[in-house]
Curated annotation (Swiss-Prot):
Ranges for region Disordered: 40-65
The organism of origin for this protein: Hirudo medicinalis (Medicinal leech)
Protein name: Hirudin-3B
Chain's role: Hirudin is a potent thrombin-specific protease inhibitor. It forms a stable non-covalent complex with alpha-thrombin, thereby abolishing its ability to cleave fibrinogen.
Residue ranges, annotated region (Interaction with fibrinogen-binding exosite of thrombin): 55-65
Glycan-bearing residues: T45
Pfam families linked to this entry: Hirudin (PF00713)
Recorded superkingdom: Eukaryota
Family per record: Belongs to the protease inhibitor I14 (hirudin) family.
GO molecular function, one term: serine-type endopeptidase inhibitor activity
């Protein structure tokens, strides 16, 4: 399973993880209806502090190729 930190606005396949916020002045928008996750400019989104099952969605393998 691969997770990508949100760091830059417009970055695809970002997942808000670990701690702090999603990049500097960016927030993570979770994709829906087949859309990829993206970092967008906006107030930072707090990342989950725990790493329990279900905290993060897996990135579909077709996005990793």
């Amino acid at each position: 399973v691969v997770y990508t930190d949100c760091t830059e606005s417009g970055q695809n396949l970002c997942l808000c993880q670990d701690s702090n916020v999603c990049g500097q002045g960016n927030k993570c928008i979770l994709g829906s209806n087949g859309e990829k996750n993206q970092c967008v400019t906006g107030e930072g989104t707090p990342k989950p502090q725990s790493h329990n099952d279900g905290d993060f969605e897996e990135i579909p393998e077709e996005y990793l190729q």
